[in-house]
């Protein structure tokens, strides 16, 4: 029995030593021994082979579309659709008339919203073209060959018996180092030395945590990286976005107060660096945050602020409405587009269904975390441009660069009801049509 304990202890020491030497130390200093690159190449080959085997099970060889949508929507504005609807009738149409047949337009939109609206599908996992040997996330897939099944079983053993313990070890070290290091740094008086230690702790921790997720990150256009005194805004998929960005540089964070593990991390970070955490439901907190952000931006020696203007996590298929508050405080905006590859794992965090711990466990049992980060050129508010227009301009640039769908809807609809202002806007548009105030609707006769 003693011999068994000795052997187990020796194996554990050897394993931990290899983890520290081959993974932990290189990641702390931002270098790599090439192990992750080899793993990703093997993984890509396996998934390509599995995809080909799966496709042989289909009689129809047509290319599948990776889309969550089942409705082909007409993107034309209300005025154009109603004009086409009226032109399809035989009676005379005069400008400003009310037509009972217009009800078909609203009925069509209503049925589309009932069957599949544009908002709620953004809060569920992205549909995949083919099964990635993780979960059956593709509705079009119904066949698995015996070979693919055996590969899936082998992959299951690798992910849960080898990768999961390794990743939990790295994540535990990274988070513990952040909490302990930030707490110790927080005891130092405010000085350049404290800022230097704080940046070092944050950077090393994020690099360790990124390695714990087998991250393969490509950063593009590094010459546009956010600079001190600026505001970095990015699309939001999960809290891992912070690790992805902070792996390449330090930021002062702004975000919603969380409980549990996330809350512990937030409180530790706030001790060493002037991060801003607030309660979204408290109006007083929101005004206080705005003032603190203005003070932060005015000091060019402070770290750039990282803000996610959507205010909630979206499934990385689209970019939803940017809240104008981030664009009212002044300063230079540094847009950043983040796009994850769902083939290797689903990075989306549905906070209304999954706790932070369960989400991290799911990520640690995925194949890897592969994503691209684009630093876009810095922008400033133009003369005569209000905060809403500025926010929409930045949102459009991020959506275009990341290949994401741009949506006007508020991400707050994830938890709340549609605001009356959205309904009133549609009512006003139709009122202009029947009042003859809309010039785009031309009178026609048949």
Curated annotation (Swiss-Prot):
Chain coiled-coil ranges: none
MF annotations from Gene Ontology: 1-acylglycerol-3-phosphate O-acyltransferase activity; glycerol-3-phosphate O-acyltransferase activity
Location(s), subcellular: Endoplasmic reticulum membrane
Membrane-spanning segments: 11-31, 146-166, 168-188
EC number, as in UniProt: 2.3.1.15, 2.3.1.51
Annotated catalysed reactions: sn-glycerol 3-phosphate + an acyl-CoA = a 1-acyl-sn-glycero-3-phosphate + CoA; a 1-acyl-sn-glycero-3-phosphate + an acyl-CoA = a 1,2-diacyl-sn-glycero-3-phosphate + CoA; dodecanoyl-CoA + sn-glycerol 3-phosphate = 1-dodecanoyl-sn-glycerol 3-phosphate + CoA; sn-glycerol 3-phosphate + hexadecanoyl-CoA = 1-hexadecanoyl-sn-glycero-3-phosphate + CoA
CDD domains for the chain: LPLAT_LPCAT1-like
Gene Ontology CC annotation, any one: endoplasmic reticulum
Membrane topology classification: Multi-pass membrane protein
Pfam families: Acyltransferase
One of the GO biological process terms: triglyceride biosynthetic process
Motif mapping: HXXXXD motif: 236-241
UniProt KW keywords: Acyltransferase, Endoplasmic reticulum, Lipid biosynthesis, Lipid metabolism, Membrane, Phospholipid biosynthesis, Phospholipid metabolism, Transferase, Transmembrane, Transmembrane helix
SMART domains in alphabetical order: PlsC
Domain of life the protein comes from: Eukaryota
Pathway participation: Glycerolipid metabolism; triacylglycerol biosynthesis; Phospholipid metabolism; CDP-diacylglycerol biosynthesis; CDP-diacylglycerol from sn-glycerol 3-phosphate: step 1/3
Domain notes from UniProt: The HXXXXD motif is essential for acyltransferase activity and may constitute the binding site for the phosphate moiety of the glycerol-3-phosphate.
Family: Belongs to the 1-acyl-sn-glycerol-3-phosphate acyltransferase family.
Role according to the record: Converts glycerol-3-phosphate to 1-acyl-sn-glycerol-3-phosphate (lysophosphatidic acid or LPA) by incorporating an acyl moiety at the sn-1 position of the glycerol backbone. Also converts LPA into 1,2-diacyl-sn-glycerol-3-phosphate (phosphatidic acid or PA) by incorporating an acyl moiety at the sn-2 position of the glycerol backbone. Protects cells against lipotoxicity.
Record protein name field: Glycerol-3-phosphate acyltransferase 3
Source organism per UniProt: Xenopus laevis
Underlying gene: gpat3
């Amino acid at each position: 029995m003693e011999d068994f304990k000795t052997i187990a202890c020796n194996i554990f020491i050897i394993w931990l030593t290899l983890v520290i030497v081959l993974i932990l130390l290189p990641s702390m200093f931002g270098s790599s021994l090439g192990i992750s690159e080899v793993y990703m190449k093997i993984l890509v080959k396996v998934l390509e082979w599995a995809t080909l085997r799966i496709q042989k099970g289909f009689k129809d060889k047509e290319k599948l579309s990776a889309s969550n949508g089942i409705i082909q929507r007409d993107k034309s504005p209300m005025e154009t659709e109603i004009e086409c609807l009226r032109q399809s009738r035989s009676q005379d149409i005069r400008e400003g008339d009310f037509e009972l047949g217009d009800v078909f337009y609203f009925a069509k939109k209503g049925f589309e919203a009932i069957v599949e609206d544009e908002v709620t599908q953004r809060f569920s996992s992205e549909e995949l073209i083919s099964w990635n040997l993780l979960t059956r996330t593709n509705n079009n897939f119904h066949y698995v060959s015996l070979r693919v099944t055996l590969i899936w079983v082998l992959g299951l053993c690798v992910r849960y018996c080898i990768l999961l313990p390794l990743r939990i070890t790295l994540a535990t070290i990274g988070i513990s180092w952040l909490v302990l290091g930030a707490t110790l740094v927080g005891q130092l008086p405010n000085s350049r030395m404290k800022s230097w230690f704080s940046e070092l702790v944050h950077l090393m921790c994020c690099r360790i945590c990124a390695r714990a997720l087998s991250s393969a990150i490509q950063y593009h256009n590094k010459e546009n990286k956010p600079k001190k005194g600026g505001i970095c805004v990015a699309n939001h998929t999960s809290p891992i976005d912070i690790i992805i960005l902070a792996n390449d540089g330090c930021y002062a964070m702004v975000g919603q107060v969380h409980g549990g593990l996330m809350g512990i991390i937030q409180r530790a970070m706030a001790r060493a660096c002037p991060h801003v955490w607030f309660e979204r439901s408290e109006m007083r907190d929101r005004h206080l945050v705005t003032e603190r952000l203005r003070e932060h931006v005015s000091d060019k020696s402070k770290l750039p602020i990282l803000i996610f203007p959507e205010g909630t996590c979206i499934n990385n298929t689209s970019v939803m409405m940017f809240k104008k508050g981030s664009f009212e405080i002044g300063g230079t905006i540094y847009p950043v587009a983040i796009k994850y590859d769902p083939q290797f794992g689903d990075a989306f965090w549905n906070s209304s269904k999954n706790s932070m711990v369960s989400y991290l466990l799911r990520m640690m049992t995925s194949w890897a975390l592969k994503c691209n980060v684009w630093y876009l050129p810095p922008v400033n508010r133009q003369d005569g441009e209000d905060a809403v227009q500025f926010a929409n301009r930045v949102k459009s640039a991020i959506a275009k660069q990341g290949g994401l769908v741009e949506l006007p809807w508020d991400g707050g609809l994830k938890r709340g009801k549609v605001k009356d202002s959205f309904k009133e806007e549609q009512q006003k548009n139709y009122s202009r049509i029947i009042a003859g105030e809309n010039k785009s609707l031309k009178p026609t006769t048949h």
